[in-house]
């Protein structure tokens, strides 16, 4: 297990060290941590914070974003996804990210889970996950739950009409979201392209 503060993260993203995450991390204290995993693409209270404004005006260069959250309990890889844009994660608790490189996805859209690397993310850390990085829901530390703020371009992860223009479309699980699942995760409608162990942390 590496840390996002180590040099190894540079392949997958970067720590955004010069922004204040204190307000939004404190706000996340009031949000539930369910036994399963819950994702909300955009949350009104989170989008009324100063850091949401910083994300739009600075990190995303003036483009509109949505600020939501992913909370719960998870210890498994289950799937990997990617977007056409960076995603910013802000750890509202300590958590672990399991990351891979899109360049390692084969032409048939399969991916060997042995290539996945795990990174510890300390509470309060903001990390930009590059568009070329495979990722999914965080994992908790030592069996504990996690809370994570998720920032993406506005309109990401919404319902999408199925299309069949290119072979990659079979991975399209939501708007701006391409998903490769592990068969053991039993994700309805997903393409089961992860090969090897469904990693547990």
Which residues fall in each region the model found?
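Aromatic-residue-lined binding/catalytic grooves and analogous aromatic/hydrophobic interfacial grooves
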Residues: 129
């Amino acid at each position: 297990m590496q840390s996002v503060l180590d040099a190894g993260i540079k392949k997958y993203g970067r720590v955004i060290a010069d922004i204040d995450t204190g307000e939004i991390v404190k706000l996340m204290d009031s949000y539930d941590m369910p036994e399963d995993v819950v994702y909300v693409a955009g949350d009104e209270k989170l989008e009324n914070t100063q850091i949401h404004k910083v994300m739009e005006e600075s990190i995303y260069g003036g483009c509109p974003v949505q600020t939501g959250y992913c909370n719960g309990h998870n210890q498994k890889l289950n799937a990997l996804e990617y977007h056409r844009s960076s995603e910013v994660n802000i750890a509202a608790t300590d958590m672990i990210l399991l990351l891979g490189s899109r360049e390692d996805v084969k032409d048939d859209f399969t991916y060997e889970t042995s290539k996945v690397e795990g990174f510890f993310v300390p509470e309060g850390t903001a990390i930009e996950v590059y568009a070329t990085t495979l990722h999914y829901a965080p994992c908790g530390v030592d069996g504990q739950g996690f809370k994570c703020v998720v920032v993406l371009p506005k309109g990401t992860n919404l319902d999408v009409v199925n299309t069949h223009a290119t072979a990659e479309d079979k991975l399209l699980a939501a708007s701006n979201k391409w998903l490769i699942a592990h068969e053991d995760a039993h994700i309805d409608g997903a393409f089961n392209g992860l090969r090897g162990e469904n990693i547990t942390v």
